[in-house]
């Protein structure tokens, strides 16, 4: 037995506890680090483990749309997104999902998803990663549930959706025009997304949002395999984080980053492409 093995019945029972705790008929978005949770199969094999997790998710979240990240960050350099051939770059589960279910993949560059049990998500490309028509906008409008399996709030991309809607001072919009390829059909896209300044010391995140969400009982923890899962309803997450940003526009940053960002914005108003690149 390998050290990553976790009993699949145990894992299913733990995931069912999560399922019981969330409202009916809403989608789930699962950000995960499967290596931390464990492999519910005897073999240490990415494809076998991918299939095992796919079956677990389908068995547990039977009536829900299951939104799984398949992000391809290299689009920012290549400016080409091949929906069927560009594998996910956020762990082996993202690669497995594209290999098996590319027809279920959303068509927006960078922040794209495979959606199992897709009831009514529209997969067409969005011009803005977190804007109108994006998977994030659709997910939040459906009051979906965020599931962080073995990862923390800093790996939670819905955080960026709230920041985009709040027009935070420490991010700015940048265009990445390029090409989407699907079934040999090429589609030009004027794609944009919010980015941070190139200097990582200026915008460095603390863990305060996760701490505050847990203290407010908006986020809840569940044991899962060798790790734990944090869950949060997206509408509560949105309201809480938005309010914190209203009270303190640099709320999620470290103290040093807050001081640097505040000094920059007092002088320049906000971060922008012209000032930062």
Regions found by a protein language model. Give the residues of each.
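N-terminal and secondary-structure boundary signal
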Residues: 1-277
């Amino acid at each position: 037995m390998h050290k990553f093995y976790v009993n699949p019945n145990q894992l299913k029972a733990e995931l069912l506890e999560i399922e019981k705790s969330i409202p009916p008929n809403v989608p789930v978005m699962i950000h995960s680090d499967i290596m931390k949770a464990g492999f519910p199969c005897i073999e240490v094999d990415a494809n076998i483990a991918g299939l095992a997790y796919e079956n677990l998710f389908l068995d547990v979240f039977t009536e829900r749309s299951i939104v799984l990240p398949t992000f391809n960050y290299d689009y920012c350099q290549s400016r080409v997104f091949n929906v069927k051939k560009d594998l996910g770059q956020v762990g082996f589960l993202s690669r497995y999902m594209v290999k098996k279910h590319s027809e279920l993949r959303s068509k927006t560059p960078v922040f794209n998803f495979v959606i199992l049990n897709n009831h009514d998500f529209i997969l067409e490309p969005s011009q803005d990663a977190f804007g109108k028509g994006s998977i994030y906008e659709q997910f939040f409008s459906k009051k979906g549930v965020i599931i962080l399996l073995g990862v923390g709030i800093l790996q939670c991309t819905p955080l960026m959706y709230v920041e985009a809607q709040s027009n935070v001072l420490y991010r700015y919009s940048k265009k990445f025009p390029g090409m989407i390829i699907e079934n040999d059909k090429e589609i030009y896209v004027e794609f944009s997304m919010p980015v941070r300044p190139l200097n990582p010391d200026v915008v460095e995140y603390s863990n305060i949002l996760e701490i505050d969400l847990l203290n407010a009982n908006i986020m809840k923890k569940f044991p899962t395999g060798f790790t734990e899962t944090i869950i949060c309803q997206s509408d509560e997450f949105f309201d809480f984080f938005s309010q914190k940003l209203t009270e303190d526009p640099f709320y999620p940053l470290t103290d040093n980053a807050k001081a640097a960002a505040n000094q920059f914005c007092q002088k320049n108003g906000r971060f922008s492409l012209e000032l930062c690149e």
